[in-house]
């Protein structure tokens, strides 16, 4: 768990951090639709960013058709595109 967080924090962009986190959660849940155990504030803290920046990035990703989100629930619509953003 700690090494996963360190790997996330080494990524440069917030979008890459969000993509890596959501892809790892999808893998852990064996589904592209899942609920995370964090609020937006807790997730922002986990990713070491401001809550407002996280909310803005998630809104942009939703607008771009990459995912759907409501509170702590997510549906990854374009997992291959998300994987590409982590590289």
Which positions does each model-derived feature cover?
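A small-molecule sensor/coupling module
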Residues: 1-16
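Short acidic/polar alpha-helix capping motifs at helix-coil junctions
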Residues: 5-7, 21, 46
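Pre-recognition alpha-helix immediately N-terminal to the DNA-recognition helix
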Residues: 17-24
């Amino acid at each position: 768990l700690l090494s996963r967080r360190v790997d996330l924090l080494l990524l440069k962009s917030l979008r890459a951090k969000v993509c890596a986190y959501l892809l790892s959660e999808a893998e852990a849940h064996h589904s592209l639709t899942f609920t995370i155990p964090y609020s937006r504030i807790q997730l922002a803290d986990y990713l070491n960013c401001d809550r407002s920046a996280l909310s803005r990035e998630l809104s942009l990703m939703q607008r771009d058709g990459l995912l759907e989100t409501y509170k702590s629930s997510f549906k990854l619509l374009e997992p291959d595109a998300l994987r590409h953003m982590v590289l």
